[in-house]
């Protein structure tokens, strides 16, 4: 498994949307400015818009709030939550652990490198821009009970978001939500 410690540390530093010089970042992470620049490119590859201003350093266009596993876990009544900053696919993560899962177990990620939709179609999942999650639920009635479930869940989540003030949220068939 690849080590993402440096890019993730850079994201946590830059999350305040203030400028941080390459020199400061290098000192903090114990590496050269050139190495910092290489890791900044990784952030860009992940879909993060990083401003580079000579003489000022690096900055994000606006602050970002990263996922907090403890805070999310407090909100989950049934099952366990796993929050991973970088993952191939939340769905694949659960599929690889089917024998260990309980109904209600959730996998949430900041970034998916190989997110998949219906019929295995891949899509780009920029870091920290959307909510990437999969939930495992054992259906006692079998797979036939899941027909239409994806659409119903999308509609319910859209209604909850609307009640919280996200008036422009819309459902795209079958379960994508857009704000």
Where in this protein do the model-derived segments appear?
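N-terminal lobe of the biotin/lipoate ligase/transferase fold
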Residues: 2-162
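Catalytic palm active-site di-aspartate
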Residues: 167-179
């Amino acid at each position: 498994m690849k080590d993402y410690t440096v890019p993730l540390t850079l994201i946590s530093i830059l999350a305040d949307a203030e400028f941080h010089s390459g020199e400061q970042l290098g000192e903090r992470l114990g590496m050269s400015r050139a190495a910092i620049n290489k890791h900044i490119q990784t952030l860009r590859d992940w879909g993060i818009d990083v401003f580079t201003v000579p003489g000022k350093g690096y900055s994000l266009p606006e602050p970002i709030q990263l996922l907090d596993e403890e805070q999310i876990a407090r909100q989950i009544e049934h099952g366990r939550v796993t929050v991973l900053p970088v993952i191939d696919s939340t769905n694949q993560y659960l599929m690889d652990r089917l024998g260990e899962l309980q109904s209600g177990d959730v996998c949430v990620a900041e970034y998916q490198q190989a997110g998949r939709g219906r019929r295995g179609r891949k899509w780009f999942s920029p870091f920290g821009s959307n909510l990437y999650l999969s939930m495992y639920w054992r259906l006692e009635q079998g797979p036939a009970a899941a027909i239409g479930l994806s659409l119903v869940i999308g509609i319910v989540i859209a209604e909850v978001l609307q009640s919280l003030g996200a008036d422009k949220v819309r459902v795209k068939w079958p379960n994508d939500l857009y704000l």
